[in-house]
């Protein structure tokens, strides 16, 4: 049976690892302390502080499990080059109509964050850009129409 692999950039892997470490610390110390304090208040059946702490403990434990599962399947993408756009590359593109330049990073779906210009290689824009080279012009369909962009640069 083939093992499922989750590809991540080095930055994405480190971010998930840090989140995991922080959640483990929070679960071990902060939540355990809240549960202990809530127990000291008496009757647990009507103790909302206790129930809230236990619920948060469950949510954190589920996220820890999810992160551990992802990281166990993770393979960090290395050996990036700047000749062809691939996962992990930063890409400088220019809107040929407005002249606006934008820098985006092509990442895996687990790392995508449009507010920080991290675009999944599986997204419509990502699929168009992966494999392209500096100087090429691409057409990107957006809700407001079709836009032409020129690829100005590829960085690691």
UniProtKB/Swiss-Prot annotation:
One Pfam family of this chain: GreA_GreB_N
InterPro entries: GreA/GreB_C_sf (IPR036953), TF_GreA/GreB_CS (IPR018151), Tscrpt_elong_fac_GreA (IPR006359), Tscrpt_elong_fac_GreA/B (IPR028624), Tscrpt_elong_fac_GreA/B_C (IPR001437), Tscrpt_elong_fac_GreA/B_fam (IPR023459), Tscrpt_elong_fac_GreA/B_N (IPR022691), Tscrpt_elong_fac_GreA/B_N_sf (IPR036805)
One function term, GO molecular function aspect: DNA binding
Keywords noted in UniProt: Coiled coil, DNA-binding, Transcription, Transcription regulation
Keyword Coiled coil tagged: yes
Family the UniProt entry places it in: Belongs to the GreA/GreB family.
Protein name as it appears in the record: Transcription elongation factor GreA
Annotated organism of origin: Thermosipho melanesiensis (strain DSM 12029 / CIP 104789 / BI429)
Lineage of the organism: Bacteria, Thermotogati, Thermotogota, Thermotogae, Thermotogales
Gene: greA
């Amino acid at each position: 049976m083939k093992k499922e692999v989750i590809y991540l950039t080095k930055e994405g892997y480190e971010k998930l690892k840090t989140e995991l470490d922080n959640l483990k610390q929070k679960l071990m110390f902060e939540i355990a302390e809240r549960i202990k304090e809530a127990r000291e208040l008496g009757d647990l059946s009507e103790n909302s502080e206790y129930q809230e702490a236990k619920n948060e403990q469950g949510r954190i434990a589920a996220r820890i499990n999810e992160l551990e599962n992802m990281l166990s399947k993770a393979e960090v993408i290395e050996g990036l080059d700047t000749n062809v756009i691939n996962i992990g590359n930063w890409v400088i593109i220019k809107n040929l109509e407005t002249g606006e330049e934008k820098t985006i990073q092509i990442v895996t779906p687990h790392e995508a964050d449009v507010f920080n210009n991290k675009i999944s290689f599986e997204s419509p824009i990502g699929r168009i850009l992966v494999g392209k080279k500096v100087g090429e012009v691409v057409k990107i369909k957006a809700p407001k129409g079709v836009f032409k962009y020129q690829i100005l640069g590829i960085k690691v």
